[in-house]
């Protein structure tokens, strides 16, 4: 599917039945009944997500799904417009960031651990391109909510990030 074809994307959004379940303590995302977890963290999906999420039909569908999920139970959500569009009245908002090189290295290490071949510089460039697209899209642009706490994780370990978030929620 062409990521620029707004009409085709809008039609697919109407057909999409996305649900989240928990199986053996793990979150499972189902698209029309199929577990799609294995696809969600691929480079292809990440890059396509940035392009297609600029389409108003996609943003509308995703916001509806995320708000419905949050209405059912307490949630921790991450996403580029969660604190500004999806859940603007959330009790706690944290804007996690890191330099593009640190994010690229983390992604590179993740892909290498999965046995995938990848190029660190290409990943960095893809991240910067995606950030630019997301910050400049017309619908739900990426920006820090005014009441969000900024946490720059560039020089933090995962344990330090967790400790910081727990302290904020505390």
Map each language-model feature to its residues.
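C-terminal alpha-helix
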Residues: 164-170
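Short acidic/histidine-centered micro-motifs embedded in hydrophobic/aromatic stretches
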Residues: 12, 126, 168
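Residue-level signature of catalytic and energy-coupling elements of molecular machines
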Residues: 33, 62, 76, 127, ...
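ATP-dependent NMP and nucleoside kinases share a basic, alpha-helical "lid"
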Residues: 37-46, 53, 57-114
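N-terminal phosphate/diphosphate-binding loop that engages ATP/GTP or pyrophosphate donors
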Residues: 1-42
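Charged, alpha-helix-enriched surfaces in structured cytosolic catalytic cores
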Residues: 4-8, 44, 53, 57, ...
């Amino acid at each position: 599917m062409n990521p620029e074809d707004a009409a085709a994307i809008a039609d697919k959004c109407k057909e999409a039945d996305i649900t989240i379940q928990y199986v053996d303590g793990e979150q499972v995302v189902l698209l029309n009944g199929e577990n799609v977890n294995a696809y969600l963290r691929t480079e292809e999906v990440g890059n396509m997500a940035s392009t297609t999420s600029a389409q108003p039909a996609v943003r509308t569908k995703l916001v509806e799904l995320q708000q419905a999920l949050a209405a059912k139970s307490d949630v921790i959500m991450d996403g580029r417009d969660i604190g500004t569009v999806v859940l603007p009245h959330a009790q706690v908002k944290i804007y996690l960031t890191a330099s593009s090189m640190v994010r690229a290295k983390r992604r590179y290490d993740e892909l290498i651990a999965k046995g995938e071949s990848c190029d660190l510089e290409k990943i960095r460039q893809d991240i910067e391109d995606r950030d630019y697209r997301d910050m400049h899209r017309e619908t739900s642009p990426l920006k820090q909510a005014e009441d969000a706490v900024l946490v720059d994780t560039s020089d933090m370990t995962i344990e330090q990030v967790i400790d910081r978030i727990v302290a904020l929620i505390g």
